[in-house]
Amino acid sequence: MNRSIEAINERAKRGFSDFLQLDPSRARARAGGLSDWLVGEVRRAIADGRLPTGSRLPASRVLAAELQVSRGVVTEAYQRLSENGQVVGHARAGTVIAAVPAPGQEDRPASKAAPEAADLFEPAPGAATFDLLRSAPAAIDLFPGLPDLTAFPRSAWLRAERTVLADFAAADLGYGDPSGAPAFRLAVTRWLARNRGIQADPAEVIIVAGVAQALAVLARVLGQAGITRIAVEDPGSLGAREQLRAWGVDTPPVLVDDAGLVVEHLRRSAASAVLMTPAHQFPTGVVLSGERRRELLGWAEDGGLIIEDDYDAEHRYDRAPVASLRAVAPERVCYAGSVSKLLAPALRVGWLLVPSRYHRAAVLAKRDTDLGNAVLPQLVLAHLMESGDLDRHLRLVRRRHRRRRDAMIAALRRELPEARLQGAAAGLHLMINFTDGLSDVDLAAAAFGRGVKVQPLSWHCQTPHQPGLVLGYAATPVRAIEQGVSLLAESYRDLQPAGE
């Protein structure tokens, strides 16, 4: 049984006026008797979720004594609720909530309708619209940003958690180091050395609640140091840009072409820091070329600061791994990564490495935010990293993600040959462009109307670019990918001018 229902039923044994804040004195000031008042109060509690289906009402004798009213008042109210179908009586279970009130029987907040495409697909959405679309249901979800969540290693996680708890000291349940659990920071340094070529001391690592919090910490720390202008890639992640702007940071756009971020444009931006995704640029999938890396590091040596978002570098299929910028210039690069694309974003665990001059301020900023991440998940993740279970999981999902990527590429070539495809050599998404001037927002809205959720490329652009879509494939089965691309192609054809 649902725990919330169990809690309600436990209260019901004692009478529940404390739970619903029932006050019979209020009823005497209203038209109608006490039974009318009690019926209305119970209906309101059902409608707003305080009494979910399956929860038990207190016995009439108990509730009457609690409210100091006659038992007949409660019995009559229960009878009326039963006649209207809101409750049902069981010999042993007592009186149980059966359903919400029928329309018109109770003044209750109207349930929210499913969002319409017109409400979701704005030309320039803010974070609220972006989050609303992320959570909006769709028959086929091709929204980027998720790994295959069905592959989450539940058995390995449970084994690791049992192992950790067996050695968990009472002192471990207290307030920990705001930088993170030492065992996890050590495991992170070994993981980064093994997978990203980064050599770091555990003391350099700050555990954060994902890259989003890493950016919030950096915005605060760099702002204190007088850096309030951080250039961002264009196109580049809308979510990251919104996170920086929420902290009052100016985010001038810097063009990304087929070789990555254009460093000459970065110099012209007059920004003293830049946020970028060099290993697998979001959303284009471009890898920063060797020549651009040298130019960028030269810019950093002249006083610039690089913020490296290494969000999905472990997922690669058709190319060799790309070295992290942090591995080359640790005093010029802030590095952020997480387990969101490795395991699941719901874990809210990531890591941040900063140049030594910012480290103390970053630790204090993290401490002031939340006193540090939860310790138990950190220790479980440390065990997964050190035992090899996380490496095994990564190998498994790489194969699965690759099959899904291949299915999407084949479907796009078959159904949408007009689209230019790029960024498919690594990651969890790819990008397509169109050359006919079609509005990508209109196309995404039309696809959503057919039950397919995709992301317009223009949402991630601050300056005009070719229209396109960002398509996630890692979290979607092959058959659904094929169906989704077919429906997307139908939407594309429907938006073409007549006669074409």
Where are these regions (language model features)?
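Conserved core segment of the aminotransferase class I/II
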Residues: 157, 334-398
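Residue-level detector of anion-binding/catalytic polar loops
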Residues: 87, 250, 305, 453
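Short glycine-rich anion-binding loops that position phosphate/pyrophosphate groups of nucleotides
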Residues: 147, 278-282, 341, 476
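N-terminal basic, amphipathic alpha-helical segments
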Residues: 1-162, 363, 367-373, 382-385, ...
